[in-house]
Amino acid sequence: MHKAGFVNIVGNPNVGKSTLMNLLVGERISIATFKAQTTRHRIMGILNTDDMQIVFSDTPGVLKPNYKLQESMLNFSESALVDADVLLYVTDTIEKPDKNADFMEKVRRVNVPVLLLINKIDLTNQEELVKLVEEWHEMLPEAEIIPISAKAKFNVDMVMKRIKELIPDSPPYFGKDQLTDKPARFFVTEIIREKILLYYDKEIPYAVEVVVEQFKEDNKSIHINAVIYVERESQKGIIIGHQGKALKKVATEARKTLEHFFQKSIYLETFVKVDKDWRSSDKELKNFGYQLD
């Protein structure tokens, strides 16, 4: 008998959802940085064996939206509550159960198994962990609580064991050689955006969107032209940097990661353009592929 199911990962920003999904899939599907709101889209990672297919979904961190981009990000997270066969709610040892009460109420109403994963337990002690488990049990009494450390890979095998037990009997939903639902261009934009998140401070990384305008691939190499959109002329200057040095650093580091990702030589050209207030524009968000009501 073949098993297949959708395992959706939700939770607040910066609790380790993307790191966990990459571990579970065994491939680097989602970018993961130390900054909150790194993930903007719902991203599928597909794990295949002879008798099983697990379709994981990484989602943006749950937050109260301040502009339309964040509304779209919340839509991705809420949609993951609807179509899951198993729901992974990821928290950490700092977060309290009463955060985001509205979203937690929606989690309580799902009618599928919920695994509540307390991540980063390497940063706390046993006494505090026991107290936290009790608090989460009061918040989600039907959930199965598993303390983990994605960074140390502690108990991740236990999570996978429970997922395999919980997903239903079903034929596969995707081809057995398929790793994700996203095209190659998407991963180019994410890798470039990851470098921007790592190398720039404050609001700059959050005002950035990346679009691949050219992607030409042959047997040995890929030629890529990418545009980095910002909201202000001042942001454009910061991204480019003095004599273009900042942008060159981003492009160089992105190229290295892309070569590892695609296992081909990468020729990357980057440009910076201003798209004023794109994060608050329905039209621009739709053009950039975000989900709106």
Model-derived features: positions:
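Conserved G1/Walker A P-loop phosphate-binding module
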Residues: 1-75, 79-81
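Conserved glycine(s) of the Walker
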Residues: 16, 155, 246
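Conserved, well-folded catalytic cores of nucleic-acid-processing
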Residues: 27, 46-50, 84-87, 94, ...
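Catalytic P-loop NTPase motifs of RecA-like helicase/translocase cores
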Residues: 39, 62-64, 96-97, 124-125, ...
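Conserved C-terminal guanine-recognition region of P-loop GTPase G domains, centered on the G4
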Residues: 51, 75-143, 216-218
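Active-site glycine-centered loops adjacent to acidic/histidine catalytic or metal-binding residues
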Residues: 58, 119, 149
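Canonical P-loop GTPase G-domain recognition
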Residues: 113, 122-180
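P-loop NTP-binding site
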Residues: 184-293
